[in-house]
Every structure is written in C-alpha cells, then in structure tokens.
C-alpha cells in the first residue's frame, strides 16, 4: 500500500520512495505537545529522512481504521517510533489519500507525538 511504501522509504532512508508516496500538493503537519500545528514540506521531510542511517528509523504502525469513498480514503494508524532500536515516542497518524491516475497518493498527514501513554 501507499502508506507502507512511505514507511519502507523512511526505514531505508530512500527520499525518492518517500516522495513517490505523496500527491504533488500534499500537506504534512504535526501537532506538538502544546497543541501548536507545525507544517513541513514533503521535500524537507524526505531530505531529512534521507540523511538518517539506513534501518535506524522504524515507525511501527497499526492500521486501525480505513474508510474509502470513491477516490478518497482516510487512514488512522496508531504507531510507536524507534530510533536505532530504542523506543523514542508514540502517537497517531491521520492520512487522507486520493486516487489519481488509478494510484493512491497521500494528500495530507497530520500526526501526534508523545512519550507517555504508549504501549511499548
């Protein structure tokens, strides 16, 4: 799936695979602990991930809810993030995907990040 492709790109530090997962006008945001919403460009995100040591970034996701209507999909994935095998943080990713040219692409991601109330 497109979502798995994104996380495979992160794990292998492959910026091209990461970028391929996104629609050309995609939006990437995170909600901080203080409820501030931060934006990041897909290019900046892919560049920062490409600088990581391969296999050092491991975001373990669970597909807990997937809704599809025509060319729109909403995907909810709780996750735990590990850096070089050590637990870093957890949270939830909320994806909006669009089907374009018969291919699903990520249009929007917003996530939460926390160190407490994690299952690890």
Task: Identify the function of each model-found stretch.
Residues 6, 18, 26, 75, ...:
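Hydrophobic pocket/interface hotspot
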Residues 27-37:
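A short gly/proline-enriched turn/hairpin at secondary-structure junctions
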Residues 32, 40-86:
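Surface-exposed, charged secondary-structure patches
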Residues 1-13, 21:
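Short, aromatic-enriched amphipathic alpha-helices that serve as compact interaction elements
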Residues 22-24, 32, 77-81, 93, ...:
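A mature extracytoplasmic/lumenal domain signature
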Residues 13-29:
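Short, well-ordered alpha-helical segments enriched in acidic and aromatic residues
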Residues 90-117:
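Short beta-strand edge/turn micro-motifs at domain boundaries
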